[in-house]
């Protein structure tokens, strides 16, 4: 969710820092840029994606360091910019318990439950021309429905 007023971004609820394997921006730099841009509320929602099929991007953050950084910067920016402690947990088949444990492992303000893979296929790089589209759509929406029932 992004909130804007007078064409100025005031709130961003989905951001990733260097704690996510697909980003290299240190949390300190991202927060400084957000603050200098006039952001009032920012949720840091780095990836945790257990079972992700690409070994180059395991998406398993260093949780103690992540939690320490969130706590430090929330205090540092107190009264100037609200920093919400968040997590984007990928939910793959067979990984529900790991996702639940991560979500419950810290006092998060905001959790995004997402899935970047279906049937162990990476959605953003998958070649959809090689599959039956109707079967894939049915699998996709069945999985979305199943996710709504697990109550992370």
Segments and roles (model prediction):
Residues 51-53, 119-123:
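Short acidic/His/Gly/Ser-rich catalytic and metal-binding motifs that mark active-site loops
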Residues 150-152:
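Conserved small/polar residues in nucleotide/adenosyl-binding loops
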Residues 42-45, 108-118:
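Non-cysteine beta-strand/loop elements that form the S-adenosyl-L-methionine
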Residues 94-103:
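Distinct, well-ordered alpha-helical segments
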Residues 135-143:
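Active-site glycine-rich loop that binds ribose-phosphate moieties when present
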Residues 1-93:
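An N-terminally biased module of ancient metal coordination in phosphate/nucleic-acid-related enzymes
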Residues 122-136:
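Surface-exposed cleft-lining segments at the edges of enzyme active sites
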